Regions:
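Conserved acidic segment of CheY-like receiver
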Residues: 2-14, 19-23, 51
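Short hydrophobic/Thr-rich beta-strand motif most characteristic of the beta2 strand and flanking loop
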Residues: 26-36, 42
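Active-site beta3 strand of CheY-like receiver
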Residues: 46-57
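Short amphipathic alpha-helix used as the core "switch/output" element in two-component signaling
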Residues: 63-75
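C-terminal output helix
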Residues: 86-88, 106-115
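A structural micro-motif at secondary-structure boundaries
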Residues: 131-132, 136-158
């Protein structure tokens, strides 16, 4: 599981730095952010293996944008890490598209376990065809399908 790319969003800079360093020590590549601004662009450019979100980030709720993220990246594992322990908030997180909810404070080893578990599950469910914007990538046949349905074939594996 090492070298997996994660986007981690936490508005508490100190906590975020501590968790980021711990995850780096476990071998993960982390894009740590303290704001939801630019998240969609980062998802598109980085294509992370997993996303970790705090529910409330600088007076913004990630639950408002989570359905759009889930719609655009249906296979992306998403963990919500929050101090909210209210059952309704937890259920709303799952309804919005989260794969797992971890309550703060948490032990980093618990977070790492959940990350590894979700990454293993997502590897088993990889689709043969990925949709990236208006393009499609067929990983089984090594094809890039353009919006006008032109096909670029690859003779080597990426």
């Amino acid at each position: 599981m090492t070298n997996s790319k994660l986007i981690y969003i936490e508005d508490d800079q100190i906590l975020g730095n501590l968790i980021t360093q711990a995850l780096v020590d476990y071998g993960f590549e982390i894009d740590f952010r303290t704001t939801l601004n630019g998240l969609q662009e980062s998802l598109a450019s980085m294509l992370p293996d997993l996303l970790i979100l705090d529910i409330e980030v600088n007076n913004q709720s990630c639950l408002d944008i989570l359905p759009a993220i889930r719609s655009q990246y249906p296979q992306l594992p998403i963990i919500i890490a929050s101090s909210h322990t209210n059952g309704a908030k937890i259920v709303r997180s799952y309804d919005a598209g989260a794969n797992h909810y971890i309550k703060k404070p948490y032990d980093v080893t618990e977070l790492v376990f959940q990350i590894q578990n979700l990454l293993q599950q997502s590897e088993k469910q990889l689709p043969a065809i990925w949709k990236i914007g208006t393009y499609q990538v067929d990983t089984a046949k090594h094809l890039l399908i353009y919006p006008d349905e032109r096909i670029l074939s690859s003779t080597y594996k990426c």
